[in-house]
């Protein structure tokens, strides 16, 4: 079994925390792993958010000791979590699984440019809080006979599909970033989290990026990628690999 050597105990703890949050939303969650050199990218799709979450993890040595050897595999998030040894800063790569459809269609690796208009972190947090409050208020006001799954889903889609400020970023992407603790005050550290942003990601600041039909909310702790609302099947701009 292949063993990944993570940069340190903190990196291992942060990876475990990310996997735990994905599993909170889907106990059968899968993740796609891509490693090149000393950088590991972990892709996941938190259930119900309709976004991709990307977590960069630093390795202490290249995959299999060869900087030219790459890792690309989809595995069980639960099995990967069980293999993380925080004290040893290692993680064993589980057996490959038949990946869900999203795992075969990833955002582009390059061509990203900065998009204007993204509000600061505090305003993004307030936007999510207001959306959650509105959802609760509107659903609680429904008469019992109208409180169906279809109606709850309709209200949810209406609220979470709204755009953030003057951008094309849907509120659900910000909600996902906050739920996965990608979006948080730098000084706030919870169980399994470090105050240190992952150096391998190169993501020093909060930013909104675009590449083709994709948008990416970049934070110091990870990224959320989502297709633009108007993107159709006839204009796919993705990395299928």
Model-derived features: positions:
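Short, surface-exposed linear patches
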Residues: 27-29, 54-56, 63-65, 238-241
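A broadly used, surface-exposed interaction patch
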Residues: 51-90
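N-terminal ordered "arm"
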Residues: 1-58
């Amino acid at each position: 079994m292949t063993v990944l050597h993570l940069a340190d105990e903190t990196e291992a703890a942060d990876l475990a925390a990310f996997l735990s949050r994905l599993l909170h939303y889907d106990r059968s969650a899968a993740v796609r792993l891509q490693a090149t050199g000393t950088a590991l990218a972990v892709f996941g799709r938190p259930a119900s958010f309709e976004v991709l979450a990307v977590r960069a993890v630093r390795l202490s040595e290249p995959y299999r000791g060869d900087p030219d050897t790459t890792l690309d595999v989809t595995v069980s998030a639960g099995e990967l979590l069980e293999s993380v040894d925080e004290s040893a800063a290692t993680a064993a790569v589980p057996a490959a699984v038949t990946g869900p459809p999203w795992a075969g269609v990833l955002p582009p690796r390059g061509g990203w440019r900065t998009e204007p208009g993204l509000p600061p972190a505090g305003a993004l947090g307030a936007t999510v809080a207001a959306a959650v409050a509105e959802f609760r208020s509107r659903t609680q006001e429904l008469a019992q006979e109208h409180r169906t799954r279809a109606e709850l889903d309709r209200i949810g889609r209406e609220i979470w599909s709204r755009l953030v400020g003057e951008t094309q970023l849907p509120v659900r992407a910000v909600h996902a970033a906050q739920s996965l603790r990608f979006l948080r005050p730098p000084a706030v550290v919870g169980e399994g989290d470090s105050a240190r942003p992952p150096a391998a990601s190169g993501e020093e600041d909060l930013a909104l990026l675009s590449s083709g039909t994709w948008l990416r909310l970049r934070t110091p702790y990870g990224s959320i990628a989502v297709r633009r609302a108007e993107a159709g099947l006839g204009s796919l701009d993705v990395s299928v690999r």
